């Protein structure tokens, strides 16, 4: 009996909340008559999208080599009432799960499984993103693609190893973030202690070559015509305001302010500290504009 009364009370409360407060709303029409377009009918409510994010690493063991698993799970996603999926097609290693003239296909990624922390390899050759597009749209799902943007490699913890463009191609070291450390400027590719330095190796957003490379990747991704493209990690790296203090960033900043920085980096921020210099505010504006303009 108490349960029935509680349900009835909850229903009454919901009804009160849903119907109350209309008297205080500002009318949107110019009058109440039929001739001037007035009326009391409310527009039909638009259904809000419901998203499922399909992380590459988190689902790699199940999806990397199995179209059947993708079909099975997308059917469940649809039956549960979701409207959209977001497919991660460029995880933190920087390698990709779609076809591109400039990107390297993702062949392995570090995962946690029942067997522990290990590498999971992809041996399949079918198009990962296109499979999600095909199978998702058959079910009436919208399919969005997501990339980790300013990333170029990943250093694994526990001595598992590393993966990514920055590790394969030594010439790309100049693309990596340079931090304003206590002892001076340090390229993050020189920080390789798997206990202290593990994680994503970011690219420098102010490097023009980096931007051109990523725009080429995005151009290839757009050819798939996904319902949306999401730019994850479209930012400076996890060292925060310590990055990026590379020669390329200095050049671009001086172009931004229209003059030379006499004492770099001290005039922006003293090495290894958060003590601001004379150009600190303009430096932050430059960083924000770099991401915005990209």
Where are these regions (language model features)?
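Aromatic- and glycine-enriched glycan-recognition loops and surfaces
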Residues: 62-80, 111-138, 211-212, 289-293
């Amino acid at each position: 009996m108490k349960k029935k009364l509680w349900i009835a009370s909850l229903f009454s409360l919901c009804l009160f909340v849903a119907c109350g407060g209309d008297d205080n709303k500002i009318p949107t029409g110019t009058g109440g008559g039929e001739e001037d377009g007035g009326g009391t009918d409310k527009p039909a409510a638009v259904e809000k999208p419901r998203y499922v994010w399909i992380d590459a690493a988190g689902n790699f063991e199940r999806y990397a080599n199995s179209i059947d698993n993708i079909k099975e799970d997308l059917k469940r996603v649809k039956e549960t009432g979701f409207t959209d999926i977001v497919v991660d097609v460029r995880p933190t290693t920087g390698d990709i799960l779609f076809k591109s003239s400039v990107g390297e296909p993702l062949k392995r990624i570090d995962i946690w499984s029942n067997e522990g922390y290990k590498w999971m390899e992809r041996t399949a050759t079918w198009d990962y993103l296109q499979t999600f597009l095909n199978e998702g749209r058959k079910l009436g799902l919208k399919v969005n693609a997501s990339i980790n943007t300013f990333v170029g490699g990943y250093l694994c913890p526990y001595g598992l190893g590393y993966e990514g463009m920055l590790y394969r191609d030594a010439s790309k070291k100049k693309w990596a973030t340079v931090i304003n450390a206590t002892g001076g400027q340090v390229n993050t590719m020189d920080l390789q202690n798997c206990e202290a330095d593990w994680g994503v190796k970011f690219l420098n957003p102010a490097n023009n070559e980096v931007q051109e490379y990523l725009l080429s990747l995005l151009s290839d991704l757009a050819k798939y015509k996904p319902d949306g493209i999401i730019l994850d990690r479209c930012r400076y790296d996890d060292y925060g305001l310590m990055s990026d203090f590379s020669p390329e960033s200095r050049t671009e900043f001086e172009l931004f302010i229209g003059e030379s920085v006499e004492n770099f980096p001290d005039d922006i921020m003293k090495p290894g500290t958060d003590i601001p210099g004379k150009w600190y505010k303009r430096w932050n504006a430059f960083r924000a504009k770099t991401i915005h303009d990209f």
